[in-house]
Amino acid sequence: IDFLDHATVLRDYYPDCEAIVREATGAAVVRAFDHNLRSAGGKKAKERIAGGQEVQGPAHVVHGDYTLTSAPQRLRDLARPPKENDTVRGILAEGETLLDADRVERAIESGRFAIINVWRSIADEPVATNPLALCDAERVSPEDLVVFEIHYSDRIGENYFAKASARHGWYFYPAMTRDEALLIKQWDSSGHLARTRGAEPDSAAPGEPCTFSFHSAFQDPATPPDAPDRRSIEVRCAVLYD
């Protein structure tokens, strides 16, 4: 797959990601709706995806992609015809929606929905620079969450930043290859934090699903100075369980 070709990724790679998430979750509906290509060298060189956006650098900030407000709103957005900045404009007919509006409302009001990223290296070499770390959701408290808005030309999104805490525990998968994929839970409406509207942490309900995982690229002190650049792609998938 030519990951620098926008149309090719939507046509050929999105279905692969949907199949991976569907197999992992058993969900009834999985639809990929957005992606980012990341490379420090590509960002510096202002590399651009054919038919799409510029290549982004690794995100060196602890964050979660969605909030109590923006997660359900993003699904509702995907149940409407795509707007100017919606990636799936390239695969939908005029007036077509990615998700069924009635099904989305049922999932939000009384069912279960999630947003899951499929993160993968696309370089020939294993990841050595700017690897991705994920925070244990059971060690995050509601007071650690800081909402920040992202203003697009056609909508306003919300992410979470994290307040630093000695409670946090971090994990990463070293030397990931292009034959491996990491599924990152960006939101799960069945998580305890989500179900209590942010009043209680996921740790208050051990054994239940977590709501989301903070994540960030980081500088590994063990990385050799001549290590190759990380090139990765993440694809966001909307997941409806019912």
Sequence positions of predicted segments:
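Non-heme Fe(II) oxygenase catalytic core, chiefly the N-lobe of the double-stranded beta-helix
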Residues: I1-N159
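Catalytic core of Fe(II)/2-oxoglutarate
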Residues: I156-D242
